[in-house]
Amino acid sequence: MELVLLDEETLYEYIFERYVELEANANDLSQDLGILSRNESELEIDIGPHRLVTRKKKAPERDEYTFSIHQNLTSLNSNRDNNNSTTGYVIWTTSTFILKWLLYNDNATIFTRGGVKDEVDITSIFQCQQDDKLRYVLELGTGTSPMFPIVFSNYVDKYVATDQKDILPRLKDNIQENQSECRRRLLKSNTIALDDLKRRTELECQIDIALLDWELFSGSKKSRNDPVLQCGPNFHLTIIAMDVIYNEYLIVPFLTTLESLFVWYTEQRVTVSALIGIQLRTQDVLEMFLEEAIIERQFIVHAVDEKELNKSRFILLHVNLP
């Protein structure tokens, strides 16, 4: 695996090569838009490692998860719900693929546990022995999926899932329904009614949902003053966003919000990094996104060049501000 620094020249080479790979693997990949199921409102989703039957030494045990998720297909096809922004009402394959990759691909430990790769110093997403800071994950455009919030709450001290107003009640319901899949920590919340589940640990995760509208956040003191978003300098924050860039109109609001979050938290002496997962659809949209992020806004972007990712229709970007 390599971390490829994208700049105003290499970003075009990267995009070209990635779409060549996509075309080469086309026969093995689904050609739909990436919705996990267009037919079912109630989904049962298993998150676990891919098992190969071999004679080699038994692989180490990894935590596995089973989710019961309600998605709203009616709202997806509505022209009235959530001001026409309806993609968050259903579950997308980007989330399941990237989540499994982060949990079960050995190359992903550079992100979950931290370290140095290709001269890039990466702070871990999960709480570990890398440093004495607490771990906070802020997810942008969570949708109604509880998978990242619940799985990551096993390993971090604070998790905030954000989206638009009409999405949040359904997200809350799905988190409540699947809270038992957090087995390594006690869940606490100021925004979600949780059961008093017993765990053999004193470790806790503060899990919350919050309204974060990309059109409003950068100039809104009200959004920034939400106590759910607050944290102290003893935290490292990882901002994650999965499959939120699928048309050109989202690029500027998303990057403006991301930039504002980096600046805002840095001013509070919180260290910040970001991971962005994207499904490869229209090449022009990806090109416009990277141009805006790298050339116009000076984000430091590294693309994850890794075998399993390269055979898929997904990319993963590690992002920082200088």
From Swiss-Prot:
Pfam families: Methyltransf_16. It comes from the Eukaryota. Its EC number is 2.1.1.-. S-adenosyl-L-methionine binds at W92, G141, T142, G143, D163, W214, M242. GO terms for cellular component: cytosol; protein-containing complex. One of its GO terms (biological process) is methylation. Keywords: Methyltransferase, S-adenosyl-L-methionine, Transferase. One of its GO terms (molecular function) is S-adenosylmethionine-dependent methyltransferase activity. Belongs to the class I-like SAM-binding methyltransferase superfamily. RKM5 family. S-adenosyl-L-methionine-dependent protein-lysine N-methyltransferase that methylates 60S ribosomal protein L1. This is Ribosomal lysine N-methyltransferase 5. It comes from Kluyveromyces lactis (strain ATCC 8585 / CBS 2359 / DSM 70799 / NBRC 1267 / NRRL Y-1140 / WM37). The gene is RKM5.
